[in-house]
Structure formats: structure tokens, C-alpha cells
Amino acid sequence: MIEVSSLKPDDRAEWEALARGYKAFYETDHSDERYEETWSALLAGERIHGLAARLDGRMVGIAHYLFHAQGWSADACYLHDLFTAPDARGQGVATALIDAVAEAARARGVAKYYWLTKQDNRPARALYDRIAAFRGFVRYDYTL
């Protein structure tokens, strides 16, 4: 059975291993200081929130999400990061995390819950196409 809970101080090592796996999947990484800053922000739970998914007591998935204002409607929930350990994929971990974030969004009363993925991430998109609606938007990043 998959158990989902908020991140706790004792989760640091397992969280960081999964967070680094997530960054490696997207061929990016950050300094150790950035991991420390992110971990501290997740534990504070003010600007960003974190969840862990466990199978048989082992952390196998993480989700980071935040709430933000929108210009034309009520606040939104953005699923910023979602990662499942490769050996735990296909067992419902990502779905459990997505559902847990949805519950947090409902409890907060937000109007919209959304996330992004790479266009060629076929396994993730197969899941997302089953549980959510693709709206056809394309994202652009302007380097500052």
C-alpha cells in the first residue's frame, strides 16, 4: 500500500536521493546549498510544500507544490516537481502523489491545479492524459 505524508526532518537523506534523481532525469543539477535551501523551504511549508510517498516504509516518490495568485480568477496550485524512483514506477506512486496534492488544493479552495512535463516524457504523459486535461499551451522561458 502506498502511504503519502508531508515531509519530515528525518526524511532528508531519502528526499535528497529522490530529488537528485529527479534533477538527473531532466539533466540538471544544483549546488549542495540549493538542496539545503529547498529542503529548509519544504520543511517550513510556507512558500512551497513537500510530500513523500512510501511503499513498505521506503520513500519512493516526492512531490513539491505551491499555491499562487492568478490575475483573472481564484488562486492556483502548481505541482512543481513530481518524481518516482525508477524501481517503483507503474505501481500508482505518481497517481497517489497527484491525488494528495489535489486534496491539499481542494482544502485550500483554489480554482486550478496544474503541472508541466517535457513534451517527450511519454510514460508521464500517458498517466497525465488519463487523469487530467491537456490544454495545448506551450511554455517559454526568458533568461534574465
Functional labels for PLM-detected ranges:
Residues 57, 92, 121:
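Conserved G/P- and acidic residue-centered "switch" motifs that form tight phosphate/ATP-binding loops
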Residues 88, 92-100:
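Conserved acetyl-CoA pyrophosphate-binding loop and the N-cap/start of the following alpha-helix
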Residues 73-76, 104:
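Conserved acyl-donor/pantetheine-binding loop and adjacent beta-alpha core of acyl/acetyltransferases
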Residues 6-74, 98-99, 135, 141-144:
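Acetyl-CoA-dependent GNAT
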Residues 75-86:
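Conserved acetyl-CoA binding element of GNAT-fold acetyltransferases
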Residues 95, 119-138:
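Conserved active-site alpha-helix within GNAT-family acetyltransferase domains
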Residues 106-117:
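Conserved GNAT acetyl-CoA-binding A-motif
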